[in-house]
Amino acid sequence: MTDYLLLFVGTVLVNNFVLVKFLGLCPFMGVSKKLETAMGMGLATTFVMTLASICAWLIDTWILIPLDLIYLRTLAFILVIAVVVQFTEMVVRKTSPALYRLLGIFLPLITTNCAVLGVALLNINLGHNFLQSALYGFSAAVGFSLVMVLFAAIRERLAVADVPAPFRGNAIALITAGLMSLAFMGFSGLVKL
């Protein structure tokens, strides 16, 4: 049980996909201008990363390894992610049309989010079992969502703050992301993996 707790805390805080592994930077910078959009994108990404992680493990374990098709792993995972994203897009369109309009082009772009493919490939490379794969996918997504929501809240405050002209816009956003990364480095002594 403590192994699963350490995996969760370690993935969310210590080995955060955005701030430590630099995966998922495109939606991190692109969708984080408004808190509402960041929360919606975080929920959609959490659903996709968790489901894609589970599906990728199942396909790798039951199809690719037994048939000795490991060289098709990346292609198979990309196809799995595309199917999961299309399913998510249909669910969001039916359940929340307002969120669907807010997310716009970023919802189909989850397919190309390198964090989603990264979590599927890292699960296999780290040798996780089914439960660990599901938890790793979920905790990576929670870490991604946490950082994106925090960053969106900070960016909303910075939009009305008195920021010097050369630092307005993306410059202050990158400085803020760097400071967040430094803050998350403080968690590195918390968990020894």
UniProtKB/Swiss-Prot annotation:
Xref: InterPro entries: Ion_transpt_RnfA/RsxA, NqrDE/RnfAE, NqrDE/RnfAE_oxidrdctase
Question: Known Pfam families for this protein?
Answer: Rnf-Nqr
Membrane-related topology note: Multi-pass membrane protein
Q: Write out the GO cellular component annotations.
A: plasma membrane
Primary place of residence? Answer: membrane
Q: What class of enzyme is it?
A: translocase
Segments traversing the membrane: 5-25, 47-67, 72-92, 102-122, 134-154, 171-191
Q: What is its EC number?
A: 7.-.-.-
GO process annotations (BP): electron transport chain
Q: Which UniProt keywords are given for this protein, alphabetically ordered? A: Cell inner membrane, Cell membrane, Electron transport, Membrane, Translocase, Transmembrane, Transmembrane helix, Transport
- Kindly list the places in or outside the cell where this protein is found, as annotated in its UniProt entry: Cell inner membrane
**Which superkingdom does the taxonomy of this entry point to?**
Bacteria
Q: Which family does it belong to?
A: Belongs to the NqrDE/RnfAE family.
Listed under subunit, the entry gives:
The complex is composed of six subunits: RnfA, RnfB, RnfC, RnfD, RnfE and RnfG.
User: PANTHER family per the record?
Assistant: INTEGRAL MEMBRANE PROTEIN OF SOXR-REDUCING COMPLEX, ION-TRANSLOCATING OXIDOREDUCTASE COMPLEX SUBUNIT A
Q: What does this protein do?
A: Part of a membrane-bound complex that couples electron transfer with translocation of ions across the membrane.
Q: What is this protein called?
A: Ion-translocating oxidoreductase complex subunit A
Organism of origin is Citrobacter koseri (strain ATCC BAA-895 / CDC 4225-83 / SGSC4696)
